[in-house]
Amino acid sequence: EWVPDIWIEDVFAACKRAPQHTYLFLTKNPQRYLDMGHAGKLPMERNFWYGTTITGPETEYFGASCVNTFLSIEPLLEPFSADDCAGFRRLGEPLWVIIGAMTGPGSKRKQPKREWVAAITEVAQSAGVPVFMKNSLKDLWGGPLIQEYPEGMVRVDGE
């Protein structure tokens, strides 16, 4: 909230001048997206993706059918039940889910369980939502990481 709207609007304007790129905007304050949307200040460009960082099922997030939205569940600190995962649709289905573990000092004490990651992945994929597992899950997952991208999003390697 300490960031003035004009700063955010300036970033959006700069991004609009380079439409060949895909932009991921990530916040822990999803109310800001709602406020900007109600004020007519949230661009609805096809290459703009609005994400919310959440760490558990109780965290509020932004979802809207008129813009590209995603969830960044990182660090995953607690399990999501099937009901919690189905609740992703309460504000509009995210078009992408990113999952990651805590990294850095002290992170070994706060690692998610594999079944937590599997539950989120299963619900997302059954709804047709691509899942991207961050490299921080490599040891926990035990197999090749699922690293899917939304349809139409250009990957860094150009695919």
Name each model feature, range by range.
Residues 1-132:
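Conserved AdoMet/S-adenosylmethionine-binding subsite of the radical SAM
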Residues 137-159:
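C-terminal accessory extensions appended to soluble enzyme cores
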